[in-house]
């Protein structure tokens, strides 16, 4: 099919080439032979009057013109897929949809477990692929490579829609035998002590690291781990401290000895966990259904936390649990 002289099938080829960056892999991804993909490149070059790709070994290196075309091409193909090809009434009980979601281990444990249990009842054939943090969430959303990001709101894209899930705050955790931690933790105490810290991605700071940087502060990290749930073992029997979301700290304290202490609040205000999705997915029935479940389960998390927060006088925590 041609539109103003352009064979629209060539856009599919261009998108595959930009994604795979290898001729054979790109051809395979859209069920073309390698000669057919080579012919598509020739036709693309003729239409756009640009080389589009050069070879560097076996890898295709896009030209600036190809880089400029790629976002619009991917968005157009995604829009066609969502609004025309896959636009069917969504029946959760009969759907075998798979959702790709980026979220932290904290949100997996304290929030997403609830979602999975509920979906198993309402849509038993629906599946999830949970992915680690990426340093380029904007790019993943733009390409439609993920269905949802569940992140602190401060790290979300400004160009895609989002919805609040619930508010959270940080606390300091340590081994009950920690001899260096004072009852009232000052910011000087906090930054001078040895820390166990969670890291997400190669370049993205954690929330607490981001907050410290905003105040020009830096802590002394003795052990870095790839997630919050790996922190407690590295506190046991040491004078190290760590920074955890309150809900997660209370969850751990039910099973292992933990001392929980308030953090200096001007440095560590409450933050918002939110869900974000690609803008073209906004009217997708499956995405709408999933978002509704997220919001309903988040309200239950918020409600169940209110009782605990009230018992702890909203901001005062025991020094040891």
Curated annotation (Swiss-Prot):
<dbReference type="InterPro" id="IPR036388">
    <property type="entry name" value="WH-like_DNA-bd_sf"/>
</dbReference>
<dbReference type="InterPro" id="IPR000847">
    <property type="entry name" value="Tscrpt_reg_HTH_LysR"/>
</dbReference>
<keyword id="KW-0804">Transcription</keyword>
<dbReference type="Pfam" id="PF00126">
    <property type="entry name" value="HTH_1"/>
</dbReference>
<feature type="DNA-binding region" description="H-T-H motif">
    <location>
        <begin position="23"/>
        <end position="42"/>
    </location>
</feature>
<dbReference type="Pfam" id="PF03466">
    <property type="entry name" value="LysR_substrate"/>
</dbReference>
<dbReference type="GO" id="GO:0003677">
    <property type="term" value="F:DNA binding"/>
</dbReference>
<comment type="similarity">
    <text>Belongs to the LysR transcriptional regulatory family.</text>
</comment>
<keyword id="KW-0678">Repressor</keyword>
<keyword id="KW-0238">DNA-binding</keyword>
<keyword id="KW-0805">Transcription regulation</keyword>
<dbReference type="InterPro" id="IPR036390">
    <property type="entry name" value="WH_DNA-bd_sf"/>
</dbReference>
<feature type="domain" description="HTH lysR-type">
    <location>
        <begin position="6"/>
        <end position="63"/>
    </location>
</feature>
<dbReference type="GO" id="GO:0003700">
    <property type="term" value="F:DNA-binding transcription factor activity"/>
</dbReference>
<dbReference type="InterPro" id="IPR037416">
    <property type="entry name" value="NodD_PBP2"/>
</dbReference>
<protein>
    <recommendedName>
        <fullName>Nodulation protein D 1</fullName>
    </recommendedName>
</protein>
<keyword id="KW-0614">Plasmid</keyword>
<keyword id="KW-0536">Nodulation</keyword>
<comment type="function">
    <text>NodD regulates the expression of the nodABCFE genes which encode other nodulation proteins. NodD is also a negative regulator of its own expression. Binds flavonoids as inducers.</text>
</comment>
<dbReference type="InterPro" id="IPR050389">
    <property type="entry name" value="LysR-type_TF"/>
</dbReference>
<keyword id="KW-0010">Activator</keyword>
<dbReference type="InterPro" id="IPR005119">
    <property type="entry name" value="LysR_subst-bd"/>
</dbReference>
